[in-house]
């Protein structure tokens, strides 16, 4: 066995002491491990060989995870914790990259061949192509449009109908105050640099990363300089505007396309801004997500549900993000379709009555603990994950199970699908638990669904901004008496003193809590006045303007600010994953490619193919087409010239699930029969023409399988009458 591995381990242990300062334990050792060549595995299994190569990387992640934990236990400065976490993420990326590099070659899709098929058969193409195209914008052709619509329809049936979710459809134009309240106006931004001569824009962190990687690949780059740059890359997500500007100067970063100087980094808001109305007085944005429309309509939705929790609302629609440098096809675009669910639930009652229906599902879970200890995702029963506390509660667990069933139903491979838990530093302070469904593609692992359990932070923000209570009422088992303390303003005196600002004062007083009111009551009794500040203005209130009222109140209901389970689906990313996971090349014929879409999402469920252009076949083509239409089966008639085998190949290439062929036996024999072909196996059966539309409908709806069809009907061996032709080339 070559001596690479022991030396690799020694290098790792030497470079990664457990309690070293974060700047010392930067990504240098990890980078060396990533670039190390894979060992030949002639004398042992490839799996054992891969695990040996991954062992030092797992060790590096585990050591850094322990280091992060110790920093937190020791209450180290936050800046040190942030650096250590950034290094942990860098090592995780190195480990994951090596895992992907070591996967079997037959597990990797031929992306170039697939993209050629997609373009040639017009699944989708760059928008405005005849004008040169616009990056990040795509038009879907007939096949892509049908596939996308079927993915959406399957989503509606799987979630909205099954869970009786309330679907709404909100406007894509959003006034600025809404997104100011949600935080998008202030925080939804990336840093951007611009070519000072031609104005070409680049995302600053991506450009800096590419530039440093290019410098590091130079053989003349010293080990010390390389280590320094690796440290910068490890911290890349944490740099602010000025730090990025300094790094661009230090490393002399230029435009990669022209070599021109670049402007200093500036924050670039990723929302498309516009103005609503002709006056230009109402700024607005194209929505960056669909969720805000659901939150704003919470009160109406709660009323529609008779005021009861839990309930869920959903929305499907386009969202917009003005990406600085969109890339990777459908994975990072500027306009995309989302499907989002907001499941509102009492935070004290997070038990789902239907959880047992998914509890026995086994799926790959990549827990936060596994990530910080360098372990891989492991298959786990969903019920066990909830019982052991890996997943926070059964409501979240139920939705993870339902997401898994949907994704596998529409064509995503279970072996290339995992659920990754957010680490503590990735979650917002108001979140309880978050999991992302991630699919393995030729681009690596990509997030396709997010599923978060969070307090309804958005509802609280919008309630404060609008003074509209966005809460539910929960009946109490027994009435309870509570002490109430509130300000009692003299509206006349306040109005006389502050006129148009009186409303501000009254709103402020109505929102004060008991503790604050008691403090101000003491000031009133001692000094006869107190001062408040609201919206940048100061107001002095005296005894004749306000008093304090104390009384008891009997409550029969209590207000509940709901928690929300929030599954958010990126339908474009799901579609791309399906394309990769279902793309195949026929064994023995490299030129014949096909997509093995499940029938439920196949663009066309069936093709109708006359054996030739013989006019005797046409009445049967018409009869079958009309019957398929009556049964709601999307189909494609291909009566063009060319051999039947070539036409089968054409329909396979766009993923048509089944094919009905009319031949001379159809014409010459009674009862009239035709063949039905399965795309994936290329096997055929023969059945009466009148039965076939119902059979295809049941196959497309998932009521029966191809195995059921083969058990019921005889396999087709070849036609018995008329001109003899080979059915498959």
Curated annotation (Swiss-Prot):
The modification Phosphoserine is found at residue 690. It is found in: Cytoplasm; Mitochondrion; Cell projection, Axon; Secreted. ATP binds at residues 321-323, 332-333, 447-448, 573. CDD domains: GlyRS-like_core (cd00774), GlyRS_anticodon (cd00858), GlyRS_RNA (cd00935). GO terms for molecular function: ATP binding; ATP:ATP adenylyltransferase activity; bis(5'-nucleosyl)-tetraphosphatase (asymmetrical) activity; glycine-tRNA ligase activity; identical protein binding; protein dimerization activity. Gene3D superfamilies: 3.30.40.230, 3.30.720.200, Anticodon-binding domain, Bira Bifunctional Protein, Domain 2, S15/NS1, RNA-binding. One of its GO terms (biological process) is tRNA aminoacylation for protein translation. One of its GO terms (cellular component) is cytosol. InterPro entries: aa-tRNA-synt_IIb (IPR002314), aa-tRNA-synth_II (IPR006195), aa-tRNA-synth_II/BPL/LPL (IPR045864), Anticodon-bd (IPR004154), Anticodon-bd_dom_sf (IPR036621), Gly-tRNA_synthase/POLG2 (IPR027031), GlyRS-like_core (IPR033731), tRNA-synt_gly (IPR002315). The keyword Mitochondrion applies. It catalyses: tRNA(Gly) + glycine + ATP = glycyl-tRNA(Gly) + AMP + diphosphate; 2 ATP + H(+) = P(1),P(4)-bis(5'-adenosyl) tetraphosphate + diphosphate. Signal peptide: none annotated. The modification Phosphotyrosine is found at residue 443. The modification N6-acetyllysine is found at residues 194, 491. The keyword Secreted applies. It is linked to Mice (Nmf249) heterozygous for the P278YK variant are used a model for human Charcot-Marie-Tooth 2D (CMT2D), which is caused by dominant GARS mutations. They exhibit reduced amplitudes of muscle compound action potentials and a large reduction in sciatic nerve conduction velocity in the absence of demyelination or remyelination, resulting from an age-related decrease in the number of large myelinated motor and sensory axons. The loss of myelinated axons is length-dependent, and there is a length- and time-dependent decrease in motor innervation of distal versus proximal muscles. Belongs to the class-II aminoacyl-tRNA synthetase family. Catalyzes the ATP-dependent ligation of glycine to the 3'-end of its cognate tRNA, via the formation of an aminoacyl-adenylate intermediate (Gly-AMP). Also produces diadenosine tetraphosphate (Ap4A), a universal pleiotropic signaling molecule needed for cell regulation pathways, by direct condensation of 2 ATPs. Thereby, may play a special role in Ap4A homeostasis. Homodimer. This is Glycine--tRNA ligase.
